[in-house]
């Protein structure tokens, strides 16, 4: 009887772990958002109505804003392909033409409708205010021609 009880407990444990693993995998698959470049999207690597992230560079001269609204349009490129993006929310402060961007959304009729925009920058980014503070002003000396005299109290 004791061996039968252990076998039953082991089977229940295996069933519980299997169920938990299946539910976890299903939840993760539903929440995964893949990153694609414009050339991959136009090649058809994504399904038409699925959510995904679009990464690339905002093409210079492509940014347009509808006056009086938050609606914007711009083109994201990876150097090989171009894809039009529409966005209807406030853009991040770092958003600029010629800079990297990651947009989350879905394709609709050949246009990427973004729900979220992340402006990316490289590791050498320095805020403008910090750059201005780091530049020497006319009253600052960039080097000393003479040694500093020591003062004694």
Curated annotation (Swiss-Prot):
Any Pfam family: CcmE
Single GO biological process annotation from the record: cytochrome complex assembly
InterPro entries: CcmE, CcmE-like_sf, NA-bd_OB-fold
Membrane-topology descriptor: Single-pass type II membrane protein
Molecular-function annotations in GO: heme binding; metal ion binding
Principal localisation: membrane
Stretches assigned to the Cytoplasmic side: 1-6
UniProt region (Disordered), positions on chain: 130-153
NCBIfam families in the record: PRK13254.1-1, PRK13254.1-2
PANTHER family reported in the protein's UniProt record: CYTOCHROME C-TYPE BIOGENESIS PROTEIN CCME HOMOLOG, MITOCHONDRIAL
Similarity comment text for this entry: Belongs to the CcmE/CycJ family.
HAMAP family: CcmE
Role noted for this protein: Heme chaperone required for the biogenesis of c-type cytochromes. Transiently binds heme delivered by CcmC and transfers the heme to apo-cytochromes in a process facilitated by CcmF and CcmH.
Name of this protein: Cytochrome c-type biogenesis protein CcmE
Species in which this protein is naturally found: Xylella fastidiosa (strain 9a5c)
Gene: ccmE
């Amino acid at each position: 009887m004791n061996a039968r009880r252990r076998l039953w407990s082991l089977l229940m444990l295996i069933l519980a772990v299997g169920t938990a693993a299946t539910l976890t995998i299903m939840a993760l698959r539903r929440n995964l958002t893949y990153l694609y470049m414009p050339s991959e999207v136009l090649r058809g690597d994504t399904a038409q109505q699925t959510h995904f992230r679009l990464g690339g560079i905002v093409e210079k001269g492509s940014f347009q804003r509808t006056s009086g609204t938050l609606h914007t349009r711009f083109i994201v490129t990876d150097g090989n392909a171009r894809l039009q993006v529409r966005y209807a929310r406030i853009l991040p402060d770092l958003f600029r033409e010629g800079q990297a961007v990651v947009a989350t959304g879905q394709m609709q009729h050949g246009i990427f409708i973004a729900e979220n925009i992340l402006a990316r920058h490289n590791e050498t980014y320095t805020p403008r205010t910090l750059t201005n503070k780091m530049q020497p002003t006319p009253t600052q000396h960039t080097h000393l021609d003479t040694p500093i005299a020591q003062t004694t109290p």
